[in-house]
UniProtKB/Swiss-Prot annotation:
Record-given protein name: Proteasome subunit alpha type-7
Upper taxonomic lineage: Eukaryota, Metazoa, Chordata, Craniata, Vertebrata
UniProt keywords, alphabetically: Acetylation, Cytoplasm, Glycoprotein, Nucleus, Phosphoprotein, Proteasome
Organism: Rattus norvegicus
GO biological process: proteasome-mediated ubiquitin-dependent protein catabolic process
Keyword Zinc (UniProt): no
């Protein structure tokens, strides 16, 4: 029996190959980073080069699900279907957010919509005639009490809460950077939190800020996509800080 074709059948050694293939596809997608600060949550995504005549707004990988929740996803943009997978998940999540608001009268919590997305993905791992969604997502936002949240889901339908995390092809390098550099001091202010995300992305992104897409959400404020000029300003400050640190090291060495 070909166990990699049967989505609902475990192989003798306990694998669901279609789910594992979807997880491997995510590892080839654009790198995305999420960091939870004190009063801010920041999402950063590696931006692929856009064709000269293409509208950049149609290739964004960060989107709002509701007034208090947004999401970034890692997909293989060059493979047919996977970016469309993200669109399906986003549309269903938005409908659920609207339905919850109409029924209950309050916006969803970040964990609620994360659990909904994870459950949707999980159903597609055990249904005949379907295949797993080829996307992983970082979901951020604020709860009623103003607490910032960051969650990550994968194609299998599992989800976890994080202080900082990365998905996509550069996830391993970025996660190692975050493990070394994520401290209370590193997220003391909004600007420091934004810089931490940019520094993490610069570990794997070439050509500096022009290949970075960045979004911030502050307490009681809507999602804001940073302009290329704002991102370049932060990158310039980071480069200046690096130069100053190098000079200090050279002085100590001499």
């Amino acid at each position: 029996m070909s166990y990699d074709r049967a989505i609902t059948v475990f192989s003798p050694d306990g694998h669901l190959f279609q789910v594992e293939y979807a997880q491997e596809a995510v590892k080839k997608g654009s790198t995305a980073v999420g960091v939870r600060g004190r009063d801010i949550v920041v999402l950063g995504v590696e931006k692929k080069s856009v064709a000269k005549l293409q509208d950049e707004r149609t290739v964004r990988k960060i989107c709002a699900l509701d007034d208090n929740v947004c999401m970034a996803f890692a997909v293989v943009a060059s493979v047919s279907g996977l970016t469309a997978d993200a669109r399906i998940v986003i549309n269903r999540a938005r409908v659920e957010c609207q339905s919850h608001r109409l029924t209950v009268g309050d916006p969803v919590t970040v964990e609620y919509i994360t659990r909904y997305i994870a459950s949707l993905k999980q159903r597609y791992t055990q249904s005949n005639g379907r295949r797993p969604f080829g996307i992983s997502a970082l979901i951020v936002g604020f709860d009623f009490d103003g607490t910032p949240r960051l969650y990550q889901t994968d194609p299998s339908g599992t989800y976890h809460a994080w202080k900082a995390n990365a998905i996509g092809r550069g996830a391993k390098s970025v996660r190692e950077f975050l493990e070394k550099n994520y401290t209370d001091d590193a997220i003391e202010t909004d600007d420091l939190t934004i810089k931490l995300v940019i520094k993490a992305l610069l570990e794997v992104v070439q050509s500096g800020g022009k290949n970075i897409e960045l979004a911030v959400m502050r307490r009681d404020q809507p999602l804001k996509i940073l302009s290329p000029e704002e991102i370049e300003k932060y990158v310039a400050e980071i480069e200046k800080e690096k130069e100053e640190n190098e000079k200090k090291k050279q002085k100590k060495a001499s």
